[in-house]
UniProtKB/Swiss-Prot annotation:
Pfam families: GrpE. The lineage of its organism: Archaea, Methanobacteriati, Methanobacteriota, Stenosarchaea group, Methanomicrobia. Its main location: cytoplasm. GO terms for biological process: protein folding. This is Protein GrpE.
Amino acid sequence: MKIFNKDGNKNSKEDTKAGAENSEAQNSGSSAEEVNKARENPEEASASSEAEKSPEVKCQEEKQVLMEKYYRLAADFDNFKKRTARQMEENRKAVLEQVLLDFVEVTDNFDRALKSAKTAEDMSSIVSGIEQLSRQFFSILEKYGLEKIESEKASEFDPHRHEAVHHIETSEVPDNTIVDVYKTGYALNSKVIRPAMVSVARNPDEAEK
């Protein structure tokens, strides 16, 4: 009987040890299985992790993402403004350069005309040269959109394009028409930049009315 009890105790210890080993193996297998599942389905694992986060943590993370987007957009917009400003300045300089080059040609012709005028014996040739320079000069102005405002005598007075310097009583031209032009007016791309200075007719009969 003592021998039986001794063997029985021994068997009981072995059974306990075996049970513990089986339990540990099962836990280890379960952990390994979870790791494998996480590797095979990272999206599900991530979703599970997200679900475990508190609303406060989620809110902070979303705020951080939005702030990073804001800073990137602000930096991009700032760079865009700088590029646009540089491009506008380069365009302005290019246009100014072309305008000046056009007028340099007129300056060269003025210099030649002055040299010729000093030795010219015929005044008509000097006048002809000045007229040619005037045409060349204004052709450059027209190239950049400048035009003279129509201000012929007896043409109708337009308060949007003319400025009345004097009113003259006369019957030679219709009432409220231009009598004389004191200064030519100009428009740039159809916009009046300087109205023509003119005198305007007032017929005596109309004035009495």
